[in-house]
Amino acid sequence: MPGHLQEGFGCVVTNRFDQLFDDESDPFEVLKAAENKKKEAGGGGVGGPGAKSAAQAAAQTNSNAAGKQLRKESQKDRKNPLPPSVGVADKKEETQPPVALKKEGIRRVGRRPDQQLQGDGKLIDRRAERRPPRERRFEKPLEEKGEGGEFSVDRPIIERPIRGRGGLGRGRGGRGRGMGRGDGFDSRGKREFDRHSGSDRSSFSHYSGLKHEDKRGGSGSHNWGTVKDELTESPKYIQKQISYNCSDLDQSNVTEETPEGEEHPVADTENKENEVEEVKEEGPKEMTLDEWKAIQNKDRAKVEFNIRKPNEGADGQWKKGFVLHKSKSEEAHAEDSVMDHHFRKPANDITSQLEINFGDLGRPGRGGRGGRGGRGRGGRPNRGSRTDKSSASAPDVDDPEAFPALA
């Protein structure tokens, strides 16, 4: 409406959070410093009107300087310590009027643990200086460690594929990119292990030409023992040890009987004899097939059977015995009695007296041929015709004349 005053208005500013008192100082410390300054000014010249006007002018200049400091303060200014020339402005900021800071809604900002107060209420930054980042060392070539624990074999850097996009002809960049650092670049290269699982090839033997040898130091993990262990486990070594032990026992018995001066020559002669016998036994034994079979037959256990001789242990009372044979008549009579027992006929059976003849059981013709050339239905045949057919003999199958139509 025209003539109506607008109650509120707004404007666009560059920093909308400019008036939120975003500083790190404690407002209570600022108030305390302002009170101390007032007391000092009041003690110097007891309150005239000139002193009051001077105090008000100083407070106004201090508030203006504090507003400018709050607007221009940034994150870099907080991290870096201020030069001593700015300390004068900080003192002026601390002498703000207490009425402006007692408004409601102002957030109390506490000091951080790395800051301390001096006696006059000034904040001191005691944060440790940050050390600069480490530099990567590209000049020093990586050395690989050999078995002996010394870095003796140098592997050239060119042989290793450089990770990332830009490599020497490898990766995405190709030759044109050169030594450029790409995504996932790592100057250390791929880690090469001394041993690979399931193979006897070590990483440095491929480049240095050294031959791989198993770990046989006699101690530690994944150890295959020493060369002396194999000699001690061989049967020849065990046999020698047994012979040496026996010779030592014999030597000890001889030394008890003989004086001390004669101990060594007796032991030496016995050892020499044992060595000569061992040399003779070591050669392979050769024999013929017959000799080998003879040795096998000696070792084989012979099986002996207790075989009874004929008529051995026979009783004399059975010498006159003979075999009894049944007569044929008795066998035939026995068979007839068995048949009569199973197939017994009654007395009034007349089946044996009847004669049974099987005639032609085919159906008779239902009609004959008509007299006028047509096929007519004949009458019923006479009863006498059946007797004629039954009395007629069957044709001979083997006679070709009986079947003239087939001829």
UniProtKB/Swiss-Prot annotation:
Cross-link Glycyl lysine isopeptide (Lys-Gly) (interchain with G-Cter in SUMO1), sequence positions: 52, 228
Positions of the UniProt region annotated as Disordered: 33-227, 242-288, 327-407
One GO cellular component, as annotated: cytoplasm
Any single biological process term in GO: PML body organization
GO function term, MF aspect, one: translation elongation factor binding
Keyword Ubl conjugation attached: yes
InterPro entries: HABP4/SERBP1-like (IPR039764), HABP4_PAIRBP1-bd (IPR006861), IHABP4_N (IPR032381)
Modified residues (N6-acetyllysine): 52, 68, 122, 140, 211, 328
Positions where Phosphothreonine occurs in the chain: 226
Biased composition (Gly residues): 164-182, 362-371
Keywords of the record: Acetylation, Cytoplasm, Isopeptide bond, Methylation, Nucleus, Phosphoprotein, RNA-binding, Translation regulation, Ubl conjugation
Entry comment on modification after translation: Phosphorylation by MTOR inhibits SERBP1 and relieves ribosome hibernation.
Cross-link (Glycyl lysine isopeptide (Lys-Gly) (interchain with G-Cter in SUMO2)): 102, 211, 228, 280
Biased composition (Basic and acidic residues): 70-80, 89-114, 122-162, 183-199, 261-274, 327-341
Record's compositionally biased regions (Polar residues): 242-256
Entries under SMART domains matching the protein: HABP4_PAI-RBP1
Transmembrane residue ranges: none
Phosphoserine modified-residue sites: 25, 197, 199, 203, 205, 208, 221, 234, 329, 391, 393
Biased composition (Low complexity): 51-68
Omega-N-methylarginine modified-residue sites: 165, 188, 216, 363, 366, 369
UniProt cross-references to Pfam families, sorted A to Z: HABP4_PAI-RBP1, IHABP4_N
Family in the record: Belongs to the SERBP1-HABP4 family.
Protein function: Ribosome-binding protein that promotes ribosome hibernation, a process during which ribosomes are stabilized in an inactive state and preserved from proteasomal degradation. Acts via its association with EEF2/eEF2 factor, sequestering EEF2/eEF2 at the A-site of the ribosome and promoting ribosome stabilization and storage in an inactive state. May also play a role in the regulation of mRNA stability: binds to the 3'-most 134 nt of the SERPINE1/PAI1 mRNA, a region which confers cyclic nucleotide regulation of message decay. Seems to play a role in PML-nuclear bodies formation.
Subunit relationships: Associates with mature 80S ribosomes. Interacts with EEF2/eEF2; interaction sequesters EEF2/eEF2 at the A-site of the ribosome, thereby blocking the interaction sites of the mRNA-tRNA complex, promoting ribosome stabilization and hibernation. Interacts with SPIN1. Interacts with CHD3 and TDRD3. Interacts with ZDHHC17 (via ANK repeats).
Protein name (database record): SERPINE1 mRNA-binding protein 1
Organism: Mus musculus
Source lineage: Eukaryota, Metazoa, Chordata, Craniata, Vertebrata
